[in-house]
């Protein structure tokens, strides 16, 4: 796909810098793949239960966003520095030991991480960074790769586990296009109500819309809800800079499909019910685990995916998609093009812009459903 086809114009005023007052207070654009491109309906997220049929299977992402931005100073010079944690080198998700409530005594007080660093001068191996003046968290730079990614040893001399120190002193990694720093409210609102498994450095944004009340109404209407885990990585912010999308170096993300969810999908297929993905991250996880021998089913598995979905891709698992409005020149927009068609998607985006919908992570959403028109 030529990447110029991923462009569209968006007024800056429509970029949502804050979430709606209520979690389910966003607007909802309804797009039917079986209708003529450009035909849309305007609705509200709080009424989502009206548009999902009884017996449907809704699948959410239960990843938990880690406060991955750390601010401190270089020991000796006092220069300001920022670290953006990417992942632990032992492969464990960020802060897995006790951000989820595990015992402090068993959690490690020293961990090796990959991180991005930013300072007025390059951060070199041997540098020691004091994240907090009281010594609660210290980062020693061990290596610097050619691409600038650092290997750091995090330790907590103050007696906290590293995970607890990150949780206490880290900042929510808001997308750069929001144009602001995080505040206390982002700890709750940049996290879905399903967040359970720490490891993401960006939120699965479609899931941000689902409130406890909305979920309760869905279940009362006979809708089944299951979960997968896909830890959203920093690459989700990476713009497409190549001319041909096939040449884009797709980032890797860790995912897991539990047995219960694989079974729920099999049950939905048996009763002829649709599988509805809450967000593009769920789509990537499910399609990465699609069972090659059994149409429409998935294999319960864990792994790493670099799946790049673009027009021409044949979806094997997902029947409908709730998703936010995405950045131009992004792989997320390419995925939506693949699911709904480029013309239909761009006409829907134009309708949303004309109606003043809010875009991106804290913005409004669209529900894409219906059988794809020939």
Swiss-Prot record:
It catalyses: 7-aminomethyl-7-carbaguanosine(34) in tRNA + S-adenosyl-L-methionine = epoxyqueuosine(34) in tRNA + adenine + L-methionine + 2 H(+). GO terms for molecular function: S-adenosylmethionine:tRNA ribosyltransferase-isomerase activity. InterPro entries: QueA, QueA_dom1, QueA_dom2, QueA_sf. Pathway: tRNA modification; tRNA-queuosine biosynthesis. It comes from the Bacteria. Keywords: Cytoplasm, Queuosine biosynthesis, S-adenosyl-L-methionine, Transferase. SUPFAM superfamilies: QueA-like. Its main location: cytoplasm. The keyword Cytoplasm applies. Its EC number is 2.4.99.17. GO terms for cellular component: cytoplasm. The keyword Transferase applies. Transfers and isomerizes the ribose moiety from AdoMet to the 7-aminomethyl group of 7-deazaguanine (preQ1-tRNA) to give epoxyqueuosine (oQ-tRNA). Belongs to the QueA family. Monomer. This is S-adenosylmethionine:tRNA ribosyltransferase-isomerase. It comes from Sorangium cellulosum (strain So ce56). The gene is queA.
């Amino acid at each position: 796909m030529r990447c110029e086809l991923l462009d569209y114009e968006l007024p800056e005023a429509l970029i949502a810098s804050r979430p709606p007052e209520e979690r389910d207070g966003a607007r909802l654009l309804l797009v039917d793949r079986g209708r003529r491109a450009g035909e849309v309906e305007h609705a509200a997220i709080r009424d989502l239960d009206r548009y999902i049929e009884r017996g449907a299977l809704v699948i959410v992402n239960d990843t938990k966003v880690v406060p991955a931005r750390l601010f401190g100073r270089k020991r000796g010079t006092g220069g300001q520095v920022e670290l953006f944690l990417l992942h632990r080198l032992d492969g464990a998700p960020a802060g897995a030991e006790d951000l989820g409530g595990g015992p402090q005594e068993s959690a490690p007080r020293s961990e090796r991480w990959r991180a991005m660093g930013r300072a007025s001068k390059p951060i070199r191996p041997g540098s020691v960074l004091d994240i907090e003046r009281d010594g609660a968290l210290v980062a020693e730079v061990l290596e610097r790769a050619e691409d600038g990614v650092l290997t750091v040893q995090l330790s907590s001399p103050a007696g906290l586990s590293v995970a607890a120190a990150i949780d206490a002193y880290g900042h929510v990694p808001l997308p750069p296009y929001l144009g602001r720093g995080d505040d206390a409210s982002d700890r709750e609102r940049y996290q879905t109500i399903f967040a359970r498994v720490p490891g993401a450095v960006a939120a699965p944004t479609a899931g941000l819309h689902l409130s406890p009340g909305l979920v309760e109404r869905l279940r009362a209407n006979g809708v089944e809800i299951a979960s997968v885990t896909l830890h959203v990585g920093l690459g989700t912010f990476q713009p497409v800079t190549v001319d041909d999308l096939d040449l884009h170096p797709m980032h890797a993300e860790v995912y897991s499909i539990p047995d219960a969810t694989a079974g729920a999908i099999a049950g939905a297929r048996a009763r002829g019910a649709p599988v509805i993905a809450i967000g593009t991250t769920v789509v990537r996880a499910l399609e990465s685990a699609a069972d090659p021998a059994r149409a429409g089913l998935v294999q319960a598995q864990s792994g790493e995916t670099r799946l790049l979905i673009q027009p021409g891709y044949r979806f094997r698992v997902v029947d409908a998609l709730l998703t936010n409005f995405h950045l131009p020149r992004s792989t997320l927009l390419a995925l939506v093009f693949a699911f709904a068609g480029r013309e239909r998607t761009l006409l829907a985006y134009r309708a949303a812009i004309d109606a003043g919908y809010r875009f991106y992570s804290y913005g409004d959403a669209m529900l894409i459903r219906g059988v794809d028109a020939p």
